Amino acid sequence: MAGLSGAQIPDGEFTALVYRLIRDARYAEAVQLLGRELQRSPRSRAGLSLLGYCYYRLQEFALAAECYEQLGQLHPELEQYRLYQAQALYKACLYPEATRVAFLLLDNPAYHSRVLRLQAAIKYSEGDLPGSRSLVEQLLSGEGGEESGGDNETDGQVNLGCLLYKEGQYEAACSKFSATLQASGYQPDLSYNLALAYYSSRQYASALKHIAEIIERGIRQHPELGVGMTTEGFDVRSVGNTLVLHQTALVEAFNLKAAIEYQLRNYEVAQETLTDMPPRAEEELDPVTLHNQALMNMDARPTEGFEKLQFLLQQNPFPPETFGNLLLLYCKYEYFDLAADVLAENAHLTYKFLTPYLYDFLDALITCQTAPEEAFIKLDGLAGMLTEQLRRLTKQVQEARHNRDDEAIKKAVNEYDETMEKYIPVLMAQAKIYWNLENYPMVEKVFRKSVEFCNDHDVWKLNVAHVLFMQENKYKEAIGFYEPIVKKHYDNILNVSAIVLANLCVSYIMTSQNEEAEELMRKIEKEEEQLSYDDPNRKMYHLCIVNLVIGTLYCAKGNYEFGISRVIKSLEPYNKKLGTDTWYYAKRCFLSLLENMSKHMIVIHDSVIQECVQFLGHCELYGTNIPAVIEQPLEEERMHVGKNTVTDESRQLKALIYEIIGWNK
C-alpha cells in the first residue's frame, strides 16, 4: 500500500500498526514497515522476529530463515530461534542446511520431539524412507520425550500413512488415513491425503467423493476465495497464497480433481477444474498447478506449455512427473534432438525421476530418427518383457477369480491395466516406424501380433482401422473396426473424431454401401444443426471434413469436376466451415487439379474453373485471420504473419489458375 509506506507514522503508533497489519494478514505491508525500521535498528530482536514471522507467512522461507539465523546469533541463549530457522530452511527445501541446524538442538530435551519430527520430515522429502520411518516409530514409541505422547499420536499415524503411500502401499495408506480421519474429525489436508491415496490405487469415485467435500466446505466457509469465478468469466483479483488458502487444501483438491478427469479423458472438464480454483496471478502459482496447466493446455497452447515445463525443471523442487513429461512431449512434437540434449544434460535427474521402462522407451524413440532398425529391436525387447508380464498377470487374475479372492483380483487387474498402459505406446511406436515408410502390411502385422491382449483396447482398434483403410483393398475389414467406435458414441456422434467418420463414410462408398454413408452423414448434419441452434456462433467441422475427404477421394480417382464441386460445397457457409484443417484438405485437391491441368492430363469445363475462382475469392475474403499452417511451437524462425493466412494462399492458388488457363496473358 503506497500511501501507508510513504506516510509519517505518529510516535508510539508503530508497534500497534505493525500488529494490526499482521492481524489482518497484510504481511507484505508489515514487511515494508519492518524493513525500514530495521535499517535504523538492525539488531532489534522484536523487529527481526516479526519480520521472520511475516516472511514465513508470505512463504518467503529463505528470507525467514535469514531473520532467524540473525536472531540466533544475537541471542544464542534462546534456542527456539534455531528451531524456527531449521523449520524455515526445511520449507525452503534446503534440506542439508535444515538438518545441520536441527542437529544442534537434539541435546535440548525441550525441543527433542519437535526436532525428531522435523528430521523425519526432512528425510521423507529427501527420499530416505527407512530413515524417516525409524524416526516416526521412535516418536510413536514415546522416545521423543514428554511432548511425544498422546497429542502427537494423530500426527504419527498420518506420517505412517504418508510413508506407506510413498512406498507404493496405497491400500494400506488409505486404511491409515481413513482411520485417522474418523478418530480426529474432518481436516482438509488429511481428507486430501486420503483422496490422493484413493487416486493412486485407481479408486477414482472414492477420491472424487473426498475432493467434493473439500471443495464444498472451502466454498461454504470461505466464499471470499472466489472459487469458480474465473471459469464463469468474471474478472477477479488474485486471492494470493494466504494461510487460509493453504489450510483449506483447495488448490491441492482442484489439482487432484483435474488429474482424475484427465486420466478419464474428460479433457475439457479437467481444464475447467483448473480455472475453478481460487484465482492467483501466474507468478503466485505453485509448481503443481503450473505443471498441470502446461499439460492440460498443451494442444491449444504448446509453446506456453513447453516454456512452463522448462521453467519448472530449473526450480527446486519441481513435481517429479515434470522431467518425464517434458521428454515425452518433446518426442510427441518430434523435437528428438532437444529430448536427447535434456537427457544428456540431466543424467542425475534421469536416475531419480525416470523408471527403467520410461528411460528405455524414450531412448528407443530418440534412436528412431537415426537408426530405425535398431530402435525397432529396442522396442521389441520392451514389448517382449511387457507381454510376459501381461501373461503372468492374466494367469494371476484367473487364479484369483477361481479362489474368489476379491482383493487379489483387484490388485492383479490394476497391475494388468498399468502394464497395458505401458505396452500400448511401445506397440504404437513400433508400428509408426513402418507407417512412416508407408509399409502398411508390416504395420498390420505388428498389430496382429498383439491381438491377444489388445483386441478390446480402443486405441489399438482405431489404429488397426486406419492401417486397413490405408491399404485401399481392405475397406470392408476397416468398416469392422470403425463401426464399433462410431456406434459406441452414436448418441453423441460429434464426440467421434471427424477423420474416423470420414474414413467410415469413404469405406461405405468404396464397398457400395451408399445408403449407410448417407445415413451417417444425415446423423452428423442433424447433430450439427442442433448444436448450431444452441450456439449460433460455434464453428463445427465434422460434416465439412467428411465431405472434404469424400471430395478428395473422387479427385484421387480422377473425377476432378465432381470432387472439386464437393469440396467447394462442403465449406459453405465460409464463416463457420473455413478453418486451418478444412483449408488443408481443400488446397490439396486444388493443387492436384492444377498439377494435372498444367501437364494437360485433364480438361476441365469453364463453368468449373469459374466456380473454383469464385470459391478462392470467398476463401480470400473470410481467411484473413485464419492461419494456413499451424507452426511448430518451438520454431525459431516464425512465418510472416501476413503470409501464413488462408487469404494469402487463396490468392496464390487463384494466380496459378489464371496462369495455367492463360487469363493473365
UniProtKB/Swiss-Prot annotation:
Which superkingdom heads the taxonomic lineage of this protein's source? Eukaryota
> Which is a Gene Ontology cellular component entry for this protein?
axonemal microtubule
Read off the SUPFAM superfamilies from this record.
Answer: TPR-like (SSF48452)
Where the TPR repeats fall, as residue ranges, is 11-44, 45-78, 154-187, 189-221, 393-424, 425-457, 459-492, 544-577
Predominant location:
other
Task of the protein: Required for polyglutamylation of axonemal tubulin. Plays a role in anterograde intraflagellar transport (IFT), the process by which cilia precursors are transported from the base of the cilium to the site of their incorporation at the tip.
Under which name does UniProt file this protein?
A: Intraflagellar transport protein 70A
Q: What is the lineage of its organism?
A: Eukaryota, Metazoa, Chordata, Craniata, Vertebrata
Q: Which gene name belongs to this protein?
A: IFT70A
